[in-house]
């Protein structure tokens, strides 16, 4: 009996070590300069095969080897942070109204819908539940969550997951510092820059002066020389590049569907990689992983 207990304990320790090594490896790729490794970020988890932003969708991403999962936050009537993209529950749950008008218990009594709007068995998860599931297994990218920056940080600290979460905002450094300076240096922060819009270069410069972000999320609806020059400018800062391949308006037409439906992966994911991207956010995580593994750009 003692041998069995010792074996089980050893097995648990091995699994814990493997998980810790996984996160360490992803962080090293995110924070360092390793051009031979591309990180895959899955948008709203694996929403094609599970409800978006659900625990099951996140578990699917973990199982397939995704490096980072993107989530969004809202606050309930009684002050809990839950994982939900929309302000209302109309599209993604079997109910109606604003998230902020319901308590957590009321939301938990409802169920999430899948991609074809059918009710499932899955419940809306809290940020705490998500971070406990992801702990030691996968990085987390909080997209729509800047309004809850300090509250989210408290959850990360409580769950021991500060080191595996990225928080983002499309704002100049000075504004972020003023609003969230108390926690800005305690998390991995990523600026979002819309390169095709006025003021993009000023936002880049505001961060270049004050800090070196782990990465910049770059959004652009065209691939004009002006946009390409700004991509180069960010690349030259030494920070990594995060580029979305979700739909054409986010990546100058080099999107997932071009890779999958038009069978042009080199003009999509290949083009993005050639711009120097370290992270690619996708709605096709399994297919992007397959593409990268064939090129030996992912384990």
Question: Model-found features: residue ranges?
Answer:
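Phosphate-group recognition and catalysis centered on beta-loop-alpha active-site segments
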Residues: 19-299
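Bacterial Sec-dependent N-terminal signal peptides
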Residues: 1-23
């Amino acid at each position: 009996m003692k041998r069995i207990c010792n074996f089980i304990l050893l097995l648990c320790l091995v699994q814990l070590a493997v998980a810790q090594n996984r996160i360490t490896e992803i962080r090293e790729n995110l924070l360092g300069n390793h051009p031979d490794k591309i990180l895959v970020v899955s948008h709203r988890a694996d929403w094609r095969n599970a409800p978006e932003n659900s625990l099951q969708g996140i578990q699917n991403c973990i199982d397939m080897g995704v490096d980072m999962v993107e989530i969004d936050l809202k606050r309930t009537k009684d002050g809990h942070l839950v994982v939900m993209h929309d302000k209302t529950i109309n599209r993604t749950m079997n109910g109606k109204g604003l998230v902020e008008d319901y308590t957590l218990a009321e939301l938990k009594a409802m169920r999430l819908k899948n991609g074809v709007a059918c009710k499932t068995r899955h419940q809306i998860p809290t940020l705490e539940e998500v971070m406990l599931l992801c702990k030691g297994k996968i990085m987390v990218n909080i997209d729509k969550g800047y309004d809850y920056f300090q509250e989210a940080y408290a959850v990360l600290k409580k769950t021991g997951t500060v080191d595996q979460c990225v928080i983002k905002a499309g704002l100049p450094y000075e504004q972020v510092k003023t609003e969230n300076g108390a926690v800005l240096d305690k998390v991995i922060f990523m600026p979002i820059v819309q390169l095709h819009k006025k003021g993009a270069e000023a936002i880049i410069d505001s961060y270049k002066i004050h800090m070196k972000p782990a990465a910049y999320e770059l959004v652009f609806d065209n691939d004009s020389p002006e946009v390409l020059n700004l991509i180069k400018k960010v690349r030259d800062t030494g920070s990594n590049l995060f580029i979305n391949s979700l739909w054409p308006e986010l990546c100058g037409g080099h999107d997932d569907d071009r890779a999958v439906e038009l069978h042009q992966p080199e003009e999509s994911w290949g083009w993005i990689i050639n711009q120097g991207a370290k992270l690619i956010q996708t709605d096709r995580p399994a297919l992007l992983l397959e593409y990268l593994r064939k090129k030996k750009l992912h384990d």
